[in-house]
Amino acid sequence: MEIGVDIVEIARIRSSYDRFGEAFMKKILTSAEMAQCLSKPDPVASLAGRFAAKEAVSKALGTGIAKGLTWHSIEVLNDETGKPCVSVYAPSFSGRVSISISHDRYSAVAMALFEPR
């Protein structure tokens, strides 16, 4: 088992979103993730949570973003109960990833657990 954790300041993500708009979201999120974020009361807080989640997953996998993974290689979507679920689209990926995401007014944090096969 491998663990990855990431925390991000929502203000930092909001600043990038204010500067680059939906182009910033499209760089980080898949179209399905973007649709879920935009449906939330504060889409930028949701974006920050997804950003932290993808960083946490990349750390748990031991690769980081840009070493075999792209932002779109990791997809974090909520199921019908609201639970975040991870899909990893990478040829060398084999295993299961669980994720937990939380945020307050200032920060978003995520923890990922990778169980290799």
Swiss-Prot record:
Cellular component GO terms, alphabetical: cytoplasm
Enumerate the InterPro entries for this protein: 4-PPantetheinyl_Trfase_dom, 4-PPantetheinyl_Trfase_dom_sf, ACPS, Ppantetheine-prot_Trfase_dom
Q: Which cysteines link up through disulfide bonds?
A: none
EC main group: transferase
Q: What is its main location?
A: cytoplasm
Q: What is its EC number?
A: 2.7.8.7
MF terms per GO, please? Answer: holo-[acyl-carrier-protein] synthase activity; magnesium ion binding
Record: residues binding Mg(2+): D6, E55
According to its UniProt entry, the protein's GO biological process terms are: fatty acid biosynthetic process
**Catalyzed reactions:** apo-[ACP] + CoA = holo-[ACP] + adenosine 3',5'-bisphosphate + H(+)
First and last residue of the signal peptide? none
Q: Which cofactor does it need?
A: Mg(2+)
> Which compartment or compartments is the protein found in?
Cytoplasm
What are the record keywords, sorted? Answer: Cytoplasm, Fatty acid biosynthesis, Fatty acid metabolism, Lipid biosynthesis, Lipid metabolism, Magnesium, Metal-binding, Transferase
**HAMAP family documented for this protein:** AcpS
**Job description of the protein:** Transfers the 4'-phosphopantetheine moiety from coenzyme A to a Ser of acyl-carrier-protein.
Family per similarity comment: Belongs to the P-Pant transferase superfamily. AcpS family.
- Its recorded name reads Holo-[acyl-carrier-protein] synthase
Gene source species: Chlorobaculum tepidum (strain ATCC 49652 / DSM 12025 / NBRC 103806 / TLS) (Chlorobium tepidum)
Q: Give the organism's phylogenetic lineage.
A: Bacteria, Pseudomonadati, Chlorobiota, Chlorobiia, Chlorobiales
